[in-house]
Amino acid sequence: MSKKSIFYLVFFSVLIVSFFFVLKSIIPGYGVRSFQVLSQVKPFTFTNQDGKLISEQNVQGKVYVAEYFFTSCTGICPILNTNMKGIYERYKDEPDFLILSHTCDPETDSVARIKQYADSLKVDNNKWIFLTGTKESLYNTARISYLLDDPKNNMENIKDQFLHTQFFALVDKNGKVRKKIYDGLKKNELKELENDIAVLLKEPATQTRFSNNLFAN
């Protein structure tokens, strides 16, 4: 092989490799294998800030981030939801993205109270959904579906328990929690979460959507 041929071979090899790395840096998820499935979200029914019932069927076909908070929290919750608002701002115009914020203090957080809280954040109620319900259902969903608290924690004497977590779960269009549980207080994990959302948004939904009591493709 001539020196000229070797030069062109090396040149185009470097060019191809460089092109791949450029794509990887500017396109979240490019070249990444499918994220592992951590759990399947179990059926749930909660009430949102507008007093409407929201179930797992209402969010089929959507990628969403799930978190837990309470409106009277003066510790980590304001920080978490400031960080969450950054995610909201990036994806608020994406039709297949939602945020689900569940209260961990339903005795205090009535529909009116979570509505007031949502309004204070100045967000679209159809994009960032705040949820309340029974303490047992909320805590069971956090532990069994979203893995945001140790699932081994006893569900007995639930009235004496208080779930307070800084973690976020990322759910795909088919109701599966994917890749990892993210620390909502760490900037590097928040950036990772933002990029992982973009990856899941490109994946197809394989389950039938359910909307207004009618199945739709």
Feature names for model-found ranges:
Residues 1-43, 210-217:
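N-terminal targeting signals for export/organelle localization
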Residues 41-42, 64, 165-167:
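Short loop/turn microsegments at loop-to-beta-strand junctions
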Residues 44-63, 88-91:
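A short beta-strand-turn-helix
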Residues 55-84, 100:
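Short active-site neighborhood of thiol/selenol oxidoreductases, capturing the structured segment around
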Residues 96-109, 126-138:
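Thiol-based oxidoreductase modules, predominantly thioredoxin-like and allied folds used
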Residues 115-165:
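Short, internal strand/loop/helix patches
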Residues 154-217:
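Thiol-/selenol-based redox modules, centered on thioredoxin-like
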